[in-house]
Amino acid sequence: MTLNLCVLTPNRIVWDSEVKEIILSTNSGQIGVLPNHAPIATAVDIGILRIRFNDQWLTMALMGGFARIGNNEITILVNDAEKSSDIDPQEAQQTLEIAEANLRKAESKRQTIEANLALRRARTRVEVINAIS
C-alpha cells in the first residue's frame, strides 16, 4: 500500500508521486506518516522532509507551510522546497556562513529575528545535503 504525496510551492510542483512513508517536520515536532494514517491538518515547520520512495530514503528542505493528510493522500503546501539533489553544497555552506555572520551583526530585535530565520533556512539546506539516505 502506498501514499500519494504532492509537495507544492506557489510557483511549482516539487513532488507528485506515490511513496511508502514520509517523516515530516511540523511545528510540534516530527511525525511519521504511513498508509491509512488518521486524517490531520498541520503546520509545517522549516525542516527536512524524508521520503521513502522505491525502498530508498530521499530528503527535501521545506521552508514552512501547511500539510493535509487523509485517505492515503498527503498534500504539502510550502513557501519553498528543494530536493537534496538540487542543492549546491558549496552555495549552501556559504549561505550558512553568511547567515551566521548576519546574526552576529544584528543590532535590533527585528534584525535578530530575520537573521535567526535565515539561519534556520540555511541550516536546513545544509542538513538536507548531509542527511543519511
UniProtKB/Swiss-Prot annotation:
GO terms for cellular component: chloroplast thylakoid membrane; proton-transporting ATP synthase complex. Keywords: ATP synthesis, CF(1), Chloroplast, Hydrogen ion transport, Ion transport, Membrane, Plastid, Thylakoid, Transport. InterPro entries: ATP_synth_F1_dsu/esu, ATP_synth_F1_dsu/esu_N, ATP_synth_F1_esu_C, ATPsynth_dsu/esu_N. It is a peripheral membrane protein. Coiled coil: none annotated. Transmembrane segments: none annotated. The keyword Transport applies. GO terms for molecular function: ATP binding; proton-transporting ATP synthase activity, rotational mechanism. Gene3D superfamilies: 6.10.140.480, F0F1 ATP synthase delta/epsilon subunit, N-terminal. It is found in: Plastid, Chloroplast thylakoid membrane. F-type ATPases have 2 components, CF(1) - the catalytic core - and CF(0) - the membrane proton channel. CF(1) has five subunits: alpha(3), beta(3), gamma(1), delta(1), epsilon(1). CF(0) has three main subunits: a, b and c. PANTHER family: ATP SYNTHASE DELTA/EPSILON CHAIN, ATP SYNTHASE EPSILON CHAIN, CHLOROPLASTIC. HAMAP family: ATP_synth_epsil_bac. Belongs to the ATPase epsilon chain family. Produces ATP from ADP in the presence of a proton gradient across the membrane. This is ATP synthase epsilon chain, chloroplastic. The lineage of its organism: Eukaryota, Viridiplantae, Streptophyta, Embryophyta, Tracheophyta.
